[in-house]
């Protein structure tokens, strides 16, 4: 990642004498680059070699030869090699993100690849990544595929994406066996897949979408499980730069507000974590928990591409990339009937789908009724029917399905939050 170069390693031995050189050839449509080394001493000769592959949207053919005079004998050949970055997706069914309504196949590319799938973690053969059918080799999910395609097209970097998700599982299911990290469980299967491919040092980011199955537990269970995972990920993937947490959506898990609040606050506790909202994805299927591709997984993938583009590839830090997130809340008139939510992204233009969105807010500690909502740059204002200054906090639960809500100029929904204190 620092040099924009990758490496393809060849290992082998040559038992026969009489050969003068080992030649490594890297070929593209633009030309051939060769390196030669003499074979000195007596056999067996080590044929270990490293081919340097630039990070670009170009497929390379790498061949190894031994020479006898002017005659070459090919001893190894690999086609369609690329060098790029490694991303991991993990969590439950919305991390798996298989097809529920509408195909993502138009986003497939020879420069997005994977090995195995969530249903075939033992696979070790490279394949073009796909997003629709979870049993297909190379399956990475619909929103990860859309995210990857946007990143590839925008930043011209090939990507290897690995999905280790499993539907319907609580956070305990995803934990590492600390005595045997590569045990035959979910964590160990993903780690083994990456370790066998020599990629554990190459993982740049992990994208986590899980929590629906923890809704019946105390949020502390979810938090403790996530903190343990974060520590283990940094141990097993030592060059990990970012962890992206998707805040779960109410619907199949009712509100799960305490878990959603904990997820909102993870970036406040750990500088390597970013959080993404799901509150303004109209493709949400409500009580069914999942998303159509259009206005659902497709949109989530595009939003993540913008976030990773900024964090990993130097794209501009636009104010609309992060989901709106309250920095402070205060009463802003003398009668206690106007409450203003100031956003952390002060430059983002806020939007509201309709006045119906006011019902997604609730005051804590006051019987005042929210009668109106308006928006501005970096702010949302709520109008109350009476003096609400006895309120101590404000909750935003959003809603499931295609219900109008609060979002920024690019449609990124405001994060759900619970009992955020009101400044007096």
How should these model regions be labeled?
Residues 1-424:
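Cell-envelope and extracellular/periplasmic
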